[in-house]
A protein has these predicted regions:
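Divalent-metal-activated hydrolytic enzyme cores
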Residues: 3-141, 149, 175-209, 217-432
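Catalytic core of membrane glycerolipid acyltransferases/transacylases, capturing the structured
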Residues: 139-171
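Conserved beta-strand-loop-short alpha-helix elements that form
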Residues: 214
């Protein structure tokens, strides 16, 4: 595999100084990290209990009080009752554990989704501050495409620490987003500015910002990188950049005024959650050999006072960006790097510096449209699609992943189908 060389912030070191309190960076959001850990633990534990509980229930299926005993265990360990019809005939035939497993996954997902929308545990609807900041930086929409790999499912709420409600997120395998769909979304946003003044008026000097997050592995770069690009991070970055440029060209060809579109490319280490950002120059061009590496910024600034650390982050971003880079883009990148410092410390504190599951460990496949409730790493593999035919490539990748995770153990592949519809359009629900 050919690995790209990166001219990042390697020239400076932390100078051997002692780390800050508890070894955390001075800009780390300690309260935020604690809240995110509680949520991650609660949700993943709910899914990970399913197999041990079903093993326990399976061993009891020929006892005289099996149904009552099984329900008691499920209620205590999983928090819900099992379908009675799945248990009633266990004394005659073997308990259908594959079917019961799938049902438990779906019920656990439903409970998680209900809690997410009812209680907003991640504070993702607190969007006003970010909306104002983005517009101050010169952007009226942040549209992010991470790879569909489940190891990037937490990219918005955890890795970048952005409120999910302020970001359009639509993952695709390899980060290869649908250009036509994105142009359509761009047109929808611009029409909203023109007709409604949302999020700002059409004459405001702001742009639509399209971002792609590609990924790589620092632990096992030859095998645990992006499967869609053969674990070649240089190929992943180039393919993402090519897709971004195709989007901009499409807007310019169809509507002229390419200045209304801005582009940004981010790399993410799926073992540490550290990001590297390829800052564009004033014309929107990005050099894949040039980036700002958050994990190196962390080392350089972790022993400073908070105000000094924030200023130094901004200096490092500017120093390692093209001279003609837009000031608003530099502000945004500095904020993303600063936010990522908290996630670097989160992985160090909670997961020992690197995730134990370097590869895939998704619990189910999410197929369709939507899924803003999925904000956790390695919980879901995404296959965004309107029809099976157009999403065949993403579905094939998901089938391969779950062939190793589930099918090899005799378990089915749980698939949650989700489709959002416009409630104001007559008949939309029935068509969905």
């Amino acid at each position: 595999m050919t690995r790209q060389t990166t001219r990042a912030v390697a020239a400076e070191t932390a100078g051997g100084r002692a780390p800050g309190p508890n070894g955390l960076h001075p800009l780390t959001d300690r309260d935020g990290n604690a809240r995110l850990q509680r949520y991650e633990d609660r949700v993943k534990t709910a899914f990970d209990r399913i197999v041990p509980v079903l093993k326990q229930i399976s061993a009891l299926q020929h006892e005289s009080d099996f149904e009552q005993h099984a329900q008691s265990i499920a209620r205590a360990e999983l928090g819900f009752d099992l379908p009675e019809y799945m248990l009633a005939d266990a004394w005659v035939t073997q308990l259908d554990l594959r079917r019961l497993f799938a049902w438990c996954v779906f019920e656990t997902y439903r409970r998680m989704a209900d809690d997410f929308f009812a209680n907003d545990p991640l504070g993702g609807r607190e969007v006003h501050a970010l909306d104002r900041f983005l517009q101050d930086c010169g952007f009226h929409q942040l549209d992010v495409t991470p790879c569909a790999d489940g190891r990037l499912a937490h990219a918005i709420s955890y890795v970048l620490r952005l409120p999910f409600g302020a970001v359009r997120r639509k993952p695709y395998a390899g980060g290869l987003f649908d250009v036509e769909n994105t142009v359509s979304k761009w047109g929808e946003v611009e029409l909203g500015r023109f007709r409604e003044g949302v999020p700002n008026t059409a004459d405001s000097p702001t742009r639509y910002l399209k971002t792609v997050i590609y990924h790589y592995s620092s632990v096992d770069p030859h095998h645990q990188g992006c499967a869609a690009h053969g674990s070649n991070d240089a190929a992943a970055a180039q393919a993402a950049l090519d897709r971004l440029l195709a989007f901009r060209q499409s807007v310019e060809n169809g509507f002229c005024c390419g200045a209304s579109v801005a582009l940004l490319l981010i790399g993410m280490d799926t073992d540490t959650d550290a990001i590297r950002v390829h800052v564009p120059d004033g014309e929107g061009r990005m050099d894949l050999t040039q980036s700002v590496d958050a994990i190196k910024v962390h080392a350089i600034t972790r022993d400073l006072e908070p105000a000094a650390a924030r200023a130094r982050v901004a200096e490092l971003v500017k120093a390692h960006a093209p001279a003609s880079a837009d000031p608003g883009m530099l502000r945004l990148v500095a904020r993303l790097i600063e936010n990522n410092l908290s996630q670097i410390d989160y992985v160090r504190q909670v997961h020992g510096g690197r995730y134990a599951d370097a590869g895939h460990a998704e619990r189910f496949m999410g197929v369709g449209i939507g899924f803003e409730e999925i904000q956790l790493r390695n919980l879901t593999y995404f296959a965004y699609l309107y029809t099976v035919e157009e999403g065949a490539a993403d579905l094939d990748v998901g089938r391969k992943i779950f062939g190793g995770l589930n099918v090899s153990r005799g378990l089915p592949i749980p698939i949650v189908i989700r489709f959002d519809y416009h409630g104001g359009v007559p008949g939309a629900r029935e068509r969905a």
